[in-house]
Each structure stands twice: as C-alpha cells, then as structure tokens.
Swiss-Prot record:
Job of this protein: One of the early assembly proteins it binds 23S rRNA. One of the proteins that surrounds the polypeptide exit tunnel on the outside of the ribosome. Forms the main docking site for trigger factor binding to the ribosome.
Region feature (Unknown): 118-213
Lineage, top ranks: Bacteria, Bacillati, Mycoplasmatota, Mycoplasmoidales, Metamycoplasmataceae
Alphabetical keyword list: Ribonucleoprotein, Ribosomal protein, RNA-binding, rRNA-binding
GO molecular function annotations of the record: rRNA binding; structural constituent of ribosome
Name of this protein: Large ribosomal subunit protein uL23
InterPro entries in UniProt: Nucleotide-bd_a/b_plait_sf (IPR012677), Ribosomal_uL23-like (IPR013025), Ribosomal_uL23/eL15/eS24_sf (IPR012678)
Tagged with keyword Cell membrane: no
Pfam family, one: Ribosomal_L23
UniProt source species: Mycoplasma mobile (strain ATCC 43663 / 163K / NCTC 11711) (Mesomycoplasma mobile)
Region of interest (Large ribosomal subunit protein uL23), ranges: 1-117
Residue ranges crossing the lipid bilayer per the database entry: none
Family: Belongs to the universal ribosomal protein uL23 family.
One Gene Ontology cellular component: ribonucleoprotein complex
C-alpha cells in the first residue's frame, strides 16, 4: 500500500492532546494496514523513529444527516509511540517554528558578526599602537644622531664668533681709550719738559753773555 493511503488523518481529542505531551500520537489508519506498514509510513512522512504501535478497530456507526440515515466508515485507531523526534500536526505551528528558527539564526549571525567586528577592531588597534611605539622608539635615535652631527660641524664657527664678539666688547673699547689718553698725557708732559729745558738754556746763555761784557 501507498504511504499516503495508510495514514488517513490524526485524531484530535482531549486525550490525544494529553498523550502528545508524552510523545504519543493517535492516527486514523486504513483497516487493511498492518503495524509494520504503519511504522514505515510514519517514519517516512514525519522523519521520526517509532518505538511501538498499538492498534484498535473502530467499527461502523450510524450517522443521521437531516432526514437521511447512514453509516460511518470503519477504520483502525493507531497509537504511535515515538522514540526520537516530534510530529507537528498543524502546519501553522511548523511555519511559526521555522520563522522562530530563522530569527534565532539571524540573531546569532548578527551577534557573531558584531563580535567578529569588535575583535578585528581591537586587533587592528593593537597593531597600530605597536607600530606607533616602534616608530616612536626608532625616531629619537635618528634625531639624536643628526643632532650630534650638526653640533660637531657647527662647534668651531660658534667659538670664532664669540672671539670676535670679545674683541669688540665695550669693556675692551674703554680700556683702549684709557691707554690712548695716557699716551697723550705722556707726550704732553715730555713736550712741556722740552720747552722748559729750552727756556732754561736760553736764560743761562744770556747770563753768561752779560758777565763777559
């Protein structure tokens, strides 16, 4: 028999809803079906693993529709005990579960992406800081070496300029002025002495001439 012909429909009653919590489901099955066929059909359609199946025959019953009377079809009631998996009888519940699963997957993917972005940003920041530290450590050495070269080249001209400044300092100028004034005074004194000597000689010559007369 075909799998779709074996299982007709699920039986939904208060008892069946209670048994669903215990992973036991009730189905209306073709009266010609056997337990092995029912087990194969349920495992194939719902993708679950069946532990055991209990069958009960449901005979025909009288049914009145308006003025007419008739009989219902006879069938078998199958109590299916599942070992693994669950059977979603209502398609709306399946769609809801699928939507919830998709939302959870999206949330997980977004959260994972955010975490990956944060980790990548932290790693990039660490790498940049390490590169900056290496640059900062290498730059002062180069600067100090350049400074040393510059100072070694420019030391001698700086000393020469200072010597020139010392020669032209105002203190030395005043000392030079003082020496020149002293020399002038000395020359004046010598000149005065010479004039005095000439005068004395002239007076002595005059006196000698007068005595001879």
């Amino acid at each position: 028999m075909n799998h779709n012909e074996i299982i007709k429909y699920p039986l939904l009653t208060e008892k069946s809803y209670k048994t669903m919590a215990q992973n036991v489901y009730v189905f209306a099955v073709d009266r010609r079906a056997r337990k092995i066929e029912i087990k194969d059909a349920i495992e194939f359609i719902f993708e679950v693993k069946v532990e055991k199946i209990n069958l009960f025959n449901v005979p025909q019953k009288e049914k009145k529709v308006g003025r007419f009377k008739g009989l219902t079809n006879s069938y078998k009631k199958a109590y299916v005990y599942l070992r693994e998996g669950k059977i979603n009888i209502f398609p709306e519940e399946i769609e809801k579960e699928q939507k919830v699963e998709k939302q959870l997957i999206k949330e997980k993917s977004t959260s994972e992406l955010k975490l990956e972005e944060k980790i990548a940003a932290k790693i990039a920041a660490k790498e940049q800081s390490e590169i900056k530290d290496e640059i900062v450590k290498s730059v002062p050495k180069k600067v100090t070496s350049i400074k040393k070269e510059i100072t070694s080249k420019e030391v001698t001209p700086i000393k020469k300029t200072t010597s020139v400044k010392k020669e032209t300092s105002p203190k030395e100028i005043t000392s030079v002025k003082k020496t020149t004034t002293k020399e002038k005074d000395k020359t004046l004194v010598v000149a005065k002495k010479a004039t005095i000597d000439t005068k004395v000689k002239s007076t002595t010559t005059k006196k000698t001439t007068t005595k001879k007369v």
